[in-house]
A protein has these predicted regions:
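Short beta-strand/turn micro-motifs at beta-sheet edges
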Residues: 1-5, 62-64
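N-terminal helix-turn-helix DNA-binding core of bacterial DNA-binding proteins
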Residues: 3-47
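Short, charged/polar surface micro-motifs in flexible loops or helix N-caps
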Residues: 21-25, 55-56, 81
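Short, well-ordered turn and helix-capping elements at secondary-structure junctions
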Residues: 33, 37, 63-65, 79
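Short, hydrophobic-biased segments on the C-terminal half of alpha helices
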Residues: 47-54
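Beta-hairpin "wing" of winged helix-turn-helix
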Residues: 56-71, 76
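Basic, amphipathic "hinge/linker" alpha-helix immediately C-terminal to the N-terminal HTH DNA-binding motif
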Residues: 71-89
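Amphipathic alpha-helical dimerization/coiled-coil segments
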Residues: 83-111
Length: 111
């Protein structure tokens, strides 16, 4: 399981990536994250991030009927959100590249 402190800076970008594919509701986002290996992310963590995305104009939300139970709030990325996602991906790749280089160097020193 990935430590929550490590997830803090990346979870919002991962949620944007999920809702960029198709409109999705909170529980389904949590399930997709779990399927990708993020472990069980509490909906209480996901919903504040979704609301922030919506407040900042990065996502739109609409209620849709559910086959079971009450209506669900589906989130979709806006054009501004897609730009932010592209920026996140570029920054994330830069960060992971730097971390990989450092870890590779450390690995070479320990042998």
């Amino acid at each position: 399981m990935i430590p929550s402190q490590m997830l803090k800076g990346t979870l919002e970008g991962c949620i944007m990536a999920i809702i960029s594919r198709q409109p999705t509701y909170g529980y389904e986002i949590a399930e997709q994250l779990k399927n990708y290996g993020f472990g069980q992310i509490a909906e209480g963590t996901i919903y504040p991030l979704l609301l922030r995305l919506e407040k900042n104009g990065l996502a739109n939300a609409e209620y849709r009927a559910s086959e079971v139970g009450p209506k669900r709030k589906y989130y979709a990325l806006t054009a501004k959100g897609r730009e932010e996602l592209a920026s996140f991906l570029a920054s994330y790749r830069e960060l992971t590249g730097a971390v990989d280089r450092l870890m590779d160097e450390m690995k070479g020193e320990s042998t």
